[in-house]
């Protein structure tokens, strides 16, 4: 089984990934693949360089470029684990790449929605090198994500978590959903 986790930056995707990892299931981050590719190209890990490489990869290899680069990693992990989580899928082309590469696997899409103002505050607090520090940067990043096609992936989600309350409320939602998916794995569904 493959669980694709999607959502806008700062929505809470990583918390879902962490919950699966706590339970022994591995993950592949498409964002990490772009960051690795940025370094491979001899560029410093800056917000601008990562964004440029992300766009350049799609120009060179198609809209599903990052997914293509991830397929090998996912394949290796599926040999060792019955469930692999893929974090950061941003287009239906990427979903299609995974469906095509793994036709025998059940693929579940989990989307997280968090209101923009709340995401902005969380991203500012997170402090990762590529996180926006101004509302204008935040909006620009959101539009970039939407141009990649993330809205289509969110619309096609099998499960949607709304992350607009307390951390404790979201934790409960995440644990409940992860348990449901794992139960489905054990029964052949979800």
From Swiss-Prot:
GO terms for MF: ATP binding
Pfam families xrefs: AAA_17
SUPFAM superfamilies xrefs: P-loop containing nucleoside triphosphate hydrolases
Binding site for ATP: 7-14
Keywords in alphabetical order: ATP-binding, Nucleotide-binding
Family membership: Belongs to the UPF0200 family.
PANTHER family in UniProt: DEPHOSPHO-COA KINASE (PTHR41930:SF1), UPF0200 PROTEIN MJ1399 (PTHR41930)
Full protein name: UPF0200 protein TGAM_0868
